[in-house]
């Protein structure tokens, strides 16, 4: 609609009903129209974030793996909504929830777990500490806020910056350097899957630090 037409104001976001009311064919100008794909993506993201979690979950159903049940899909929507530009983006963002532990572990190399300010040996110690923290949380208490509080405390005790401490955890748990919010993701994965994936990462790190 904005290719050749303007509402005469700075407004950019309209519902279809609002456009139908405001649009005038006589105000369409010929020539000079430029299709801005980046702007379209931005507007699409705005519309996505305006949806309720329930509405977005319904729209995402055909874009996410069939293995992700409706309850889990609705639970992950709040974690990914702000990151979505297009509905199709959701598939990659939620894949870690349905991938096997082996597939997740196969997505990264040992050195990808290591923050820039640390060595592989130091990272192994930090990740082992993170595992101990998670193992100390009962399954019924395995919630985002509790996990974040305990992990931040552990990072401080080790003298690690939170971002550095969280990096190997994120990659171990999701197989990716970029993912939905870490602690919400951990809550959805559950205690046992988190522990299993960190164990797999520790095994990979042990090979990295083992003497030749």
Feature roles, as predicted:
Residues 1-48, 55, 171-173, 177, ...:
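Alpha-helical recognition segments enriched in aromatics with Gly/Pro capping
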Residues 53-158:
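Small-residue-rich helix-loop
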Residues 14-18, 23, 35-39, 51-59, ...:
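Generic recognition of stable, solvent-exposed alpha-helical segments in well-folded globular domains
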Residues 30-36, 68-76, 156-164, 177:
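Structural motif
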Residues 3-4, 44-47, 64, 80, ...:
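Generic structural signal for hydrophobic core residues of well-folded globular domains
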Residues 19-27, 67, 104-111, 156-159, ...:
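Short, mixed-charge aromatic SLiMs
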Residues 142-212:
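Charged substrate- and nucleic-acid-binding regions of tRNA-handling and nucleotidyl-transfer enzymes
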């Amino acid at each position: 609609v904005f290719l050749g037409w303007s509402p005469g104001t700075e407004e950019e976001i309209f519902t279809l009903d609002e456009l139908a009311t405001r649009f005038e064919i006589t105000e369409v100008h010929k020539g000079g129209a430029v299709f801005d794909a980046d702007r379209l993506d931005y507007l699409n993201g705005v519309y996505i974030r305006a949806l309720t979690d329930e509405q977005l979950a319904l729209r995402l159903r055909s874009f996410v793996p069939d293995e992700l049940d409706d309850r889990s899909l609705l639970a992950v929507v709040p974690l990914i909504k702000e990151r979505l530009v297009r509905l199709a983006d959701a598939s990659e963002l939620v894949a870690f929830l349905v991938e096997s532990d082996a597939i997740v572990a196969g997505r990264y190399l040992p050195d990808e777990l290591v923050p820039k300010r640390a060595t592989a040996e130091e990272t192994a110690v930090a990740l082992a500490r993170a595992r101990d923290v998670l193992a100390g949380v009962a399954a019924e208490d395995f919630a985002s806020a509790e996990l974040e509080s305990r992990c931040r405390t552990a990072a401080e005790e080790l003298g690690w910056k939170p971002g550095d401490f969280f990096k190997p955890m994120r990659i171990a748990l999701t197989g990716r350097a970029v993912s939905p919010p870490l602690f919400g993701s951990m809550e959805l994965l559950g205690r046992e899957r988190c522990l299993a994936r960190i164990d797999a990462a520790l095994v990979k790190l042990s090979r990295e630090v083992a003497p030749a």
